[in-house]
């Protein structure tokens, strides 16, 4: 399984960060974030961590990262300094470290990086969305008008989010906001052309040739 997350901020002592996340201290924040992460991620999963891992130049943050399961890939953020990147490399915490990553998943293409980046064709049949963090917004669709989906811990109850859940979220966003005009609900969720104005929830195309997957399963 593929997971995406960002903005652990391990060792960040400032209350303005950990208090809004529902914690009483930065130590509690670190322990709960690690617990949540390891509850859902398996050792053979792939995890894209989109920056701002640690906030102190000591062993605390590194030890936190070592406790996280999965094959971890880092898209570095503004707090991932050269010194910290060097430490990540020496300790072999990540499989790879880059500015960003692009992956294709089904009909979607995702550009993943730390800072939000406006995408030009996120409304198209084969959309490209930016997965990013940095802003610490709680609304994962705060910048959806620019094709940006927020994967930071703040927007996902301090858990990483799976790529399947992201796709499900985006499909529902398209439907709820009528970015693709709804006729047959099945086609809208699947982002395919509807060939009927039937109101029974299915068009003839869907009945004849149902698409794989889909919000309704």
Enumerate the language-model features and the residues they cover.
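Short, glycine/acidic-enriched loop or turn micro-motifs at the edges of active sites
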Residues: 10, 55, 80, 117, ...
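N-terminal active-site segment of His-dependent metallophosphoesterases
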Residues: 1-61, 151, 155
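A general structural motif
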Residues: 44, 69-71, 107, 126-127
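Cysteine-centered metal-binding/redox modules
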Residues: 179-217
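Metal-dependent catalytic neighborhoods of phosphoester/phosphodiester hydrolases
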Residues: 50-67, 76, 81-96, 121-125, ...
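Active-site neighborhood of phospho(di)ester-bond hydrolases with catalytic His/Asp-centered motifs
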Residues: 5-6, 47-52, 72-78, 112-113, ...
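Conserved beta-sheet core of the metallophosphoesterase superfamily
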Residues: 90-179
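A short, conserved beta-to-alpha structural element at the edge of catalytic cores
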Residues: 24-40, 70-90, 154-172
């Amino acid at each position: 399984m593929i997971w995406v997350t960002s903005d652990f901020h391990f060792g960040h002592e400032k209350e303005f960060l950990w208090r809004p996340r529902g914690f009483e201290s930065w130590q509690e924040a670190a322990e709960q974030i690690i617990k949540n992460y390891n509850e859902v991620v398996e050792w053979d999963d792939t995890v894209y961590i989109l920056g701002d891992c640690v906030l102190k130049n000591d062993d605390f943050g590194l030890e936190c990262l070592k406790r996280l399961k999965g094959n971890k890939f880092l898209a570095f953020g503004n707090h991932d300094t050269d010194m910290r990147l060097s430490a990540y490399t020496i300790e072999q915490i990540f499989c790879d470290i880059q500015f960003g990553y692009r992956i294709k998943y089904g009909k979607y293409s995702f550009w993943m990086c730390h800072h939000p980046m406006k995408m030009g064709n996120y409304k198209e049949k084969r959309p490209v969305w930016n997965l990013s963090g940095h802003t610490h917004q709680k609304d994962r669709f705060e910048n959806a008008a620019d094709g940006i989906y927020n994967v930071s811990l703040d927007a996902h109850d301090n858990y990483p989010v799976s790529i399947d859940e992201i796709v499900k979220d985006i499909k529902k966003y398209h439907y709820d906001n009528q970015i693709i005009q709804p006729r047959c609900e099945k086609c809208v969720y699947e982002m395919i052309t509807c060939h009927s104005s039937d109101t029974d929830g299915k068009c003839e195309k869907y009945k004849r040739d149902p698409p794989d997957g889909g919000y309704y399963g």
